[in-house]
């Protein structure tokens, strides 16, 4: 049985962002066709930020944006084997290096290589090409990835928001401050954020639309509004968590320090919070908070929360496009007693 893993590759190197693909000083700034022959094409360029590129079997390479007349060579979409001649992948990772993985409870085990995928004159046979010069269809490919990427991001944000709430409550209890009004206020705001993000996730699935071939697509309005809400408010939720937890988020002893015969018992003594809270227990909470929000995984998440599936501006555009603004205008006119809009 073939268990083929496909990695979608969309974001180009882009070069000068103020110029379209066809007006770059370096034509390779966007993946494009450099030669055509009867049995296929040869492509050149690079795709950036491709999570897990080296772990899959196939690279589904698609345009990163809409193309126009004159940019036919950039309107290329194809399925390329990861080991095809000319494919080169540079990997980076936020995995901790040379550290005790007990101090990195998330990034020590859950980490992904980020691939910088280079197509150095790669031949693609005709039967692996989906789009070949049809500029009017380039944006369809680009948009299709954005929707699913944002749905995945929204799903992760919903679970992640609940995790931040749980950590905030646990560390507040360990610190003996769970009853303080300002702590409860911050956690309440985190709870509201988590609830709204999950509500958007559930709404986009409940209002999914079924296409002509039977495939279900999440509702674009709720998907994009939810992704925007989760990303735009993430930093504030992390700030609340850090404020509740305290400076030990970045200064707590390593787990190995508790095993040191000279200082282990002292670390356990002074890292304790309430009398019934063990010092190592509290320290492990700090390590999880640090790893999630202020270190290896946390740094990666801070960026990907904003950039995955397109930045905040992209979500604002799509949300506005799918919101029924005309209906809202009619509701306002009716409320004002003005009847129908003059344009109708």
Residue ranges and their predicted role:
Residues 1-44:
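Gly/Pro-rich turn-and-neighbor structural signature
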Residues 4-6, 39, 57-59, 74-78, ...:
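Structural beta-strand/beta-sheet cores of well-ordered domains, especially the beta-sheet scaffolds
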Residues 46, 50-99:
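A short core secondary-structure module
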Residues 100-195:
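Glycine-rich beta->alpha junctions and the first turn(s) of the following alpha-helix
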Residues 169-178, 201-212, 244:
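Secondary-structure edge/capping motif, primarily at the C-terminal ends of alpha-helices
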Residues 184-188, 216-224:
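Short, charged, amphipathic alpha-helical segments
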Residues 221-344:
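Alpha-helix capping/hinge segments and adjacent helical runs
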């Amino acid at each position: 049985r073939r268990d083929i893993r496909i990695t979608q590759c969309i974001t180009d190197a882009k070069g000068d962002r103020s110029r379209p693909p066809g007006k770059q000083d370096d034509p390779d700034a966007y993946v494009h066709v450099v030669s055509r022959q009867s049995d296929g094409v040869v492509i050149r360029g690079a795709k950036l930020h491709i999570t897990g590129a080296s772990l899959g079997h196939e690279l589904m390479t698609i345009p990163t944006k809409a193309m126009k007349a004159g940019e036919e060579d950039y309107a290329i979409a194809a399925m390329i084997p990861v080991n095809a001649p000319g494919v080169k992948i540079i990997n980076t990772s936020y995995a901790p290096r040379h550290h005790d993985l007990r101090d990195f409870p998330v990034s020590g085990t859950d980490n992904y290589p980020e691939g910088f995928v280079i197509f150095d004159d790669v031949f693609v046979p005709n039967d692996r090409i989906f789009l070949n010069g049809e500029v009017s269809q380039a944006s369809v490919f680009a948009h299709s990835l954005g929707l699913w990427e944002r749905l995945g991001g929204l799903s992760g944000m919903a679970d992640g928001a609940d995790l931040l709430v749980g950590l905030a409550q646990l560390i507040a209890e360990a610190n003996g401050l769970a009853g303080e009004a300002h702590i409860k206020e911050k956690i309440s705001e985190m709870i509201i954020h988590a609830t709204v993000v999950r509500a958007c996730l559930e709404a986009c699935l409940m209002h999914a639309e079924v296409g002509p071939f039977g495939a279900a697509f999440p509702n674009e309005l709720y998907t994009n509004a939810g992704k925007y809400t989760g990303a735009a408010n993430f930093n504030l939720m992390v700030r609340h968590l850090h404020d509740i937890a305290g400076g030990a988020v970045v200064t707590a002893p390593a787990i190995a320090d508790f095993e040191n015969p000279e200082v282990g018992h002292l670390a356990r003594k002074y890292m304790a919070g309430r009398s019934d809270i063990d010092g190592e227990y509290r320290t492990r909470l700090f390590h999880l908070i640090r790893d999630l929000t202020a270190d290896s995984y946390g740094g990666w998440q801070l960026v990907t929360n904003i950039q995955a599936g397109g930045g905040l501006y992209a979500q604002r555009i799509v949300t506005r496009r799918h919101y029924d603004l005309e209906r809202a205008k009619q509701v306002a006119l009716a409320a004002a007693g003005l009847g129908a809009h003059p344009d109708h």
